[in-house]
């Protein structure tokens, strides 16, 4: 193993992490926009109903 291998591997790993965080952030923003649109249309998230006697 050479120094260059470790350097390139670390740059590659950093690039993968950066891409993963970018995709995750993009997907989360998209999901939040979809939820906001549903709530604006009057559709709310389902909540579990309480059982009788509990």
Curated annotation (Swiss-Prot):
TM ranges? 7-24
Any GO BP annotation: heme transport
One GO cellular component this record assigns the protein to is:
plasma membrane
Q: Does the keyword Transmembrane helix apply?
A: yes
Q: Which UniProt keywords apply?
A: Cell inner membrane, Cell membrane, Cytochrome c-type biogenesis, Membrane, Transmembrane, Transmembrane helix, Transport
List, alphabetically, the Pfam families matched.
CcmD
**Coarse class of the protein's main subcellular location:** membrane
Membrane topology, as annotated: Single-pass membrane protein
* InterPro entries membership: Haem_export_protD_CcmD
- Annotated compartments: Cell inner membrane
Q: What does this protein do?
A: Required for the export of heme to the periplasm for the biogenesis of c-type cytochromes.
Q: Which family does it belong to?
A: Belongs to the CcmD/CycX/HelD family.
Could you identify this protein by its name? Heme exporter protein D
Gene source species: Rhizobium leguminosarum bv. viciae
The gene name on file is cycX
